[in-house]
Curated annotation (Swiss-Prot):
Subunit structure: Homodimer. Interacts with VP1. Interacts with VP2. Interacts with NSP2 and NSP6.
Main location: host cell
Modification after translation, per record: O-glycosylated.
Entry's localization field: Host cytoplasm
Protein name: Non-structural protein 5
Entry's Gene Ontology cellular component terms: host cell cytoplasm
Similarity section: Belongs to the rotavirus NSP5 family.
GO MF annotations in UniProt: ATP hydrolysis activity; magnesium ion binding; nucleotide binding; RNA binding
One GO term (biological process): viral genome replication
Organism: Rotavirus X (isolate RVX/Human/Bangladesh/NADRV-B219/2002/GXP[X])
Length: 176
């Protein structure tokens, strides 16, 4: 059998030196930061950690040295210029539009309910009329069939045998 490769993982980290990194560029003790570095860590990791702190300190210096743009445009006051609306007017308009939307929704619901009631009343009338028509049709059918049956039975004595056979076959055909 071939040997299975083994991987050995270390349980303990070896702590090495403490590095001092200058964050703000001042040579004071307050601006110095101590970083623990592993002796067995990758070289790129230790380089990248110190490099990132140096970049951070340079970026911080550049930001503090830059003068900010006009602060009048970026800051807002309670009373705006005459051409622009104040925040109070904007909030009132927003509240009014919300209230208008709510009232519009309520009005639409009321209109829908009224239309449904009208549709329901017309549909009820249509249903009642269709029931009346069906009842009248069934009554007339019963009357015509009953009367026809009675006349056939009363006059069956006067019919000949072939006429009786054809009458029976016609009745059976209508029953199907």
């Amino acid at each position: 059998m071939s040997e299975v490769p083994r991987f050995e993982l270390r349980n303990k980290r070896k702590v090495g030196k403490k590095q001092k990194v200058d964050i703000f560029g001042d040579k004071d003790d307050e601006s110095m930061l101590q970083i623990d570095c592993e002796t067995d860590s990758l070289i790129s990791e230790s380089v990248s950690s110190t490099h990132s702190y140096e970049d951070y300190s340079k970026a911080y210096k550049e930001l503090t040295l830059e003068t900010p743009a006009d602060t009048n445009d970026s800051t807002s006051t309670i009373i705006d210029s005459a051409y622009e609306e104040s925040w109070y007017d904007k909030t009132i308009k927003d509240e009014q539009t919300k209230e208008n939307k709510k009232t519009d929704k309520k009005l639409k619901r009321i209109e829908n309910i009224k239309e449904n009631n009208q549709n329901d009343s017309t549909s009820m009338q249509i249903a009642q009329l269709s029931l009346r028509i069906q009842r009248i049709e069934s009554e007339t059918k019963l009357k015509t069939l009953d009367s026809a049956y009675n006349t056939i039975i009363t006059q069956a004595d006067n019919l000949t045998t072939p006429q009786k056979k054809s009458l029976i076959s016609a009745i059976l055909a209508t029953m199907r």
